[in-house]
C-alpha cells in the first residue's frame, strides 16, 4: 500500500530522493519517531511481558489523540460562536466542525470492541502494573467535558472531586480552572438561541402566540373529552389533559422553569428554551434550516458520548466485575455507571423538546413579515444586497 501523502523516496515520480531543501518526509512531518516509541510496556520492563498490554496502551493513546482533536474543534467552534452576529458562512463552518466531532465520537464508540478482544484474564496479567493510573485521570477528557458544558455541580462525586487526581500537577489544575470559568459551548449556544428572530414581544411574539395555541388545543381536547359517554374514559382523558397542562406550565411560567434549572432538571435559560422550540417548529423555513441542523448535531454529540460511556461501563464490568475498585482508587464500575445519568447530558433540554410539541395544524402561522424574514432565498433583494456588500469588502 502506498503512502497516503507521498512517495517514501521523496519523489512522486519515483526518482531519486530529494534533499532536505525539498521539505520534510512523511515520518518527520508526523514525528513518528516519538509517536511510535511512546508505547512503554511496564510488563516488559519487569521481565514479565504481557502481549495484550501493547493493545491496551495503543488504544488509549488513540483515544487521547482523538480527544485532542475534539478539543481543537470545540475551541474553534466556541470562537465562532463568540460574536454577537453570526454570518451564514460561520454557521456553515460550525456545522462542518460539529459534524467532524460527531464522526470522531462514532469512531471512539466503535473502538471499544477492539479492547474487548482482550479477555479478563489477559487484563489481569498486567492490571497491577497500571495502579494507580486510571482513565479517571484523563485530563483531556475532563477538559472536553468542561468545554462542552458539564458543570461541577452536576458531576457525580465518588471518593473524591474530579480535579483532585491532578493535585500534583499545578498546570493541569490551572487548565481545569480556566475551562470551568470560561464560557462553554453550552453557554454560547444559549446566548445564540436567546437571539432567535421572532421572540421579540413587540414583533412576531412567538412565545405569546404559542401559549395561546396550547391553551386553545387543550380547551378543544377538554371539550371533546366532556362529550365522552363512558365515565371512566372521560375521567382518564381529563386527567391526562390536566397533566399536560401542568407540563406546559413548566415552560410558560418562568418561575417554574427557573426552579427546574436550579434543581438541575433543566439547563437552558427561559429565553434560550423559547428559541430552541421556535427553531424546532419552523425548521423548514430557510433561515432556520441550519440552526435546526446545529441543534441535531449537539444532540448527536451528547448521545454518542453517552454511548461511549455505556460501552466503557460494560467493558469494565466484563473485565473487573462490579465490586472491585478502579486502578486509580475510584469505585470503578459503580462510578462509571453513574455517569450514564442525565446529569452528564449537556444538551438535555434539546432531547426534551418533543415533550412540548403540538400538532402542525396548531403551530402559530407566520405573519407576512416573519415569513419574509425567515425566507431569505438566493436571488432575493436582501440576499443580493448582502452579496454586493460582501464583494465590496
From Swiss-Prot:
Binding residue positions for heme: 312
Bound cofactor: record note: Binds 1 heme group per subunit.
Gene Ontology terms for molecular function: heme binding; metal ion binding; tryptophan 2,3-dioxygenase activity
Pfam families on file: Trp_dioxygenase
Description of activity control: Stimulated by low concentrations of hydrogen peroxide (5 uM), ascorbate (0.1-0.3 mM), and sodium hydrosulfite (0.1 mM). Inhibited by high concentrations of hydrogen peroxide (0.1 mM), ascorbate (10 mM), and sodium hydrosulfite (1 mM).
Tagged with keyword Secreted: no
Stretches of the chain forming a coiled coil according to its record: none
UniProt binding sites for substrate: 56-60, 127, 327
Enzyme's top EC category: oxidoreductase
Activity profile over pH: Optimum pH is 8.0.
Record has Transit peptide as a keyword: no
Entry similarity comment: Belongs to the tryptophan 2,3-dioxygenase family.
Name of the protein in its database record: Tryptophan 2,3-dioxygenase
Organism of provenance: Aedes aegypti (Yellowfever mosquito)
Amino acid at each position: 500500500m502506498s503512502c497516503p501523502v507521498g512517495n517514501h523516496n521523496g519523489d512522486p515520480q519515483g526518482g531519486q530522493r530529494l534533499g532536505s531543501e525539498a521539505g520534510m518526509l512523511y515520518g518527520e512531518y508526523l514525528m513518528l519517531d516519538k509517536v511510535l516509541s511512546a508505547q512503554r510496556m511496564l510488563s516488559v520492563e519487569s521481565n514479565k511481558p504481557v502481549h495484550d498490554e501493547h493493545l491496551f496502551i495503543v488504544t488509549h493513546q488513540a483515544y487521547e489523540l482523538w480527544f485532542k482533536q475534539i478539543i481543537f474543534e470545540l475551541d474553534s467552534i466556541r470562537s465562532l460562536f463568540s460574536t454577537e452576529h453570526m454570518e451564514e458562512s460561520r454557521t456553515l463552518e460550525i456545522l462542518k466542525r460539529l459534524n467532524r466531532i460527531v464522526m470522531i465520537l462514532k469512531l471512539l464508540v466503535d473502538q471499544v470492541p477492539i479492547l474487548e478482544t482482550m479477555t479478563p484474564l489477559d487484563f489481569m496479567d498486567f492490571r497491577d502494573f497500571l495502579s494507580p493510573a486510571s482513565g479517571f485521570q484523563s485530563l483531556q477528557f475532563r477538559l472536553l467535558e468542561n468545554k462542552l458544558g458539564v458543570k461541577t455541580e452536576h458531576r457525580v462525586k465518588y471518593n473524591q472531586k474530579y480535579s483532585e487526581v491532578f493535585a500534583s500537577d499545578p498546570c493541569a489544575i490551572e487548565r481545569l480552572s480556566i475551562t470551568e470559568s470560561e464560557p462553554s459551548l453550552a453557554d454560547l449556544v444559549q446566548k445564540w438561541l436567546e437571539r432567535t428572530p421572532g421572540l421579540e414581544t413587540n414583533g412576531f411574539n412567538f412565545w405569546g402566540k404559542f401559549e395561546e395555541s396550547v391553551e386553545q388545543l387543550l380547551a378543544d381536547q377538554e371539550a371533546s373529552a366532556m362529550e365522552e359517554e363512558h365515565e371512566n374514559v372521560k375521567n382518564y382523558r381529563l386527567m391526562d389533559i390536566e397533566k399536560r397542562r401542568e407540563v406546559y406550565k413548566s415552560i410558560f411560567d418562568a418561575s417554574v422553569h427557573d426552579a427546574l434549572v436550579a434543581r438541575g432538571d433543566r439547563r437552558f435559560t427561559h429565553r434560550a428554551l423559547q428559541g430552541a422550540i421556535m427553531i424546532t417548529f419552523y425548521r423548514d423555513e430557510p433561515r432556520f434550516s441550519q440552526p435546526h441542523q446545529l441543534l441535531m448535531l449537539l444532540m448527536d454529540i451528547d448521545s454518542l458520548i453517552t454511548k461511549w460511556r455505556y460501552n466503557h461501563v460494560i467493558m469494565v464490568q466484563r473485565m473487573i466485575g462490579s465490586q472491585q475498585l478502579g486502578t486509580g482508587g475510584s469505585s470503578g464500575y459503580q462510578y462509571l455507571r453513574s455517569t450514564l445519568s442525565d446529569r452528564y447530558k449537556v444538551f438535555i433540554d434539546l432531547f426534551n423538546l418533543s415533550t412540548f410539541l403540538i400538532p402542525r395544524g396548531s403551530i402559530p402561522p407566520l405573519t407576512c413579515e416573519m415569513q419574509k424574514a425567515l425566507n431569505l432565498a438566493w436571488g432575493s433583494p436582501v440576499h443580493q444586497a448582502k452579496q454586493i456588500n460582501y464583494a465590496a469588502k
